[in-house]
Amino acid sequence: MFMGEYSHTLDVKGRLIIPAKFRNQLGEKFIVTRWMEHALRAMPMPVWEKLEQQLNQLPLGKKEARQFKRFVMAGAMEAEIDKQGRIIIPSNLKTYAGLAKNVIVTGSGDSFEIWSDENWQSYTAETAENFDDIAEGLVDFDF
């Protein structure tokens, strides 16, 4: 399971160190794609394959379904970790996520997310402010 919050830096070549605890769970190759709130989502191949199946079952007669599928699939890339524990983030994904030097890597259960420090700080501040309301809105979640 991917969990925790880690602060790292993106080097000038667009390489990002993946936390050691995450590397052990990823396998040889994994997928990184655009995700919600201008973050990137990275996941092991089995998780990607499940998501891919779900995307392929979306009703393509609905514009939103086509948009979501295209956006996620077109933004997806296969990644490998180098000997120094880094991955290369291509420029299109860096631009989408607003990644500069300071990057936050966050665990998200079956996957992890890559955020710009600025976007993450803004997101967590807003979420913290509304956390009780968010929790109460999860009607199917048994605390």
From Swiss-Prot:
Subcellular location: Cytoplasm, Nucleoid
Domain annotation SpoVT-AbrB: ranges: 5-47, 76-119
Keyword Repeat: yes
Gene Ontology biological-process entries: negative regulation of DNA-templated transcription initiation
Main location: cytoplasm
PROSITE patterns according to UniProt: SPOVT_ABRB (PS51740)
Pfam families in the record: MraZ (PF02381)
Similarity comment text for this entry: Belongs to the MraZ family.
Entries under NCBIfam families matching the protein: division/cell wall cluster transcriptional repressor MraZ
Name of the protein described by the UniProt record: Transcriptional regulator MraZ
